[in-house]
UniProtKB/Swiss-Prot annotation:
Any one GO molecular function term: oxidoreductase activity
Residues the record lists as binding substrate: S139
Protein name listed in UniProt: Alcohol dehydrogenase-related 31 kDa protein
Keyword entries, A-Z: Oxidoreductase
InterPro entries registered for this protein in UniProt: ADH-rel (IPR002427), NAD(P)-bd_dom_sf (IPR036291), Sc_DH/Rdtase_CS (IPR020904), SDR_fam (IPR002347)
PROSITE patterns per UniProt: ADH_SHORT (PS00061)
């Protein structure tokens, strides 16, 4: 059980929808500090959060997740002056715009990866940090494909791949930073707007989503926090239809586990065994 009490949490997302509801729940967990980095200032939302727990310090910065990593580093140097350290980094910035592939990929995947690469040194135990937890908030269509939102789905598949790769013991045993993901099902806020399919053949289905049964952002936010509290390194959760489900992960490449062992091994005999097994296949 991951105890959020006293933690310093940094949430990179727009303060609305899932992000706002998740932040509301976090404020009930007796966290010490909450940094909100978002593209647009939302003072009413910040005031609403502060009213939940007056003793929790809330900091706000306008933030463009698509900025270059060099600029991001300067940005987080300033953030760390106020935060001192980060226990939990939540990546929740998201965009579904099938007509703007670059923006969708840059927001959902590239920006998230740059954020993680920028923040990790502050958390890394071998670099003076205390370890911690990185939470990537993504989508169920990062687990299963979507014929309607192809670019969005591709970006979310990337989030899952990045999460699983970074959670490998190769990193975790060194830096002490656990990495997990929560795949959210569709919410009312997501479907209640104009949605464009990647190809015109899928537009009818995109339009029908407005009538589809969806979870509320409040329930989804609650389950994101539930997943954080129950988390272990490398876990992927589904938050959908009011419930929370742990994903059973699979290895599809038959040499995956041997390949990882090969990379980590310094024993020549072990390496020869891997190569022999690979060539037999």
């Amino acid at each position: 059980m991951y105890d959020l009490a006293g933690k310093h949490v940094c949430y990179v997302a727009d303060c609305g929808g899932i992000a706002l509801e998740t932040s509301k729940v976090l404020m009930t967990k007796n966290i010490a500090k909450l940094a909100i980095l978002q593209s647009v200032e939302n003072q009413p939302a910040i005031a609403q959060l502060q009213s939940i727990k007056h003793s929790t310090q809330i900091f706000f910065w306008t933030f463009d997740v698509t900025m270059a990593r060099e600029e991001m580093k300067k940005y987080f140097d300033e953030v760390m002056v106020q935060m001192d350290y980060i226990d939990v980094l939540i990546n929740g910035a998201t965009l579904c715009d099938e007509r703007n592939i670059d923006a969708t990929i840059n927001t959902n995947l590239t920006g998230m990866m740059n954020t993680v690469a920028t923040v990790l040194p502050y958390m890394d135990r071998k670099m003076g940090g205390s370890g911690g937890l990185i939470v990537n908030v993504t989508s169920v269509i990062g687990l299963d494909p979507s014929p309607v939102f192809c670019a969005y789905s591709a970006s979310k598949f990337g989030v899952i791949g990045f999460t699983r790769s970074l959670a490998d013991p190769l990193y975790y045993n060194q830096n002490g930073v656990a990495v997990m993901a929560v795949c959210c099902g569709p919410t009312k806020v997501f479907v209640d707007r104009e949605l464009n399919a990647f190809l015109e053949y899928g537009q009818t289905f995109a339009d029908r989503l407005r009538l589809a049964p969806c979870q509320s952002t409040a329930v989804c936010g609650q389950n994101i926090v539930n997943a954080i509290e129950r988390s272990q390194n490398g876990q992927i959760w589904i938050a959908d239809k009011g419930g929370l489900e742990l994903v059973t992960l699979h290895w599809y490449w038959h040499m995956a586990d041997q390949f990882i062992s090969y990379m980590q091994s310094t024993d020549d005999e072990d390496q020869e065994c891997f190569l022999s097994a690979a060539y037999r296949k």
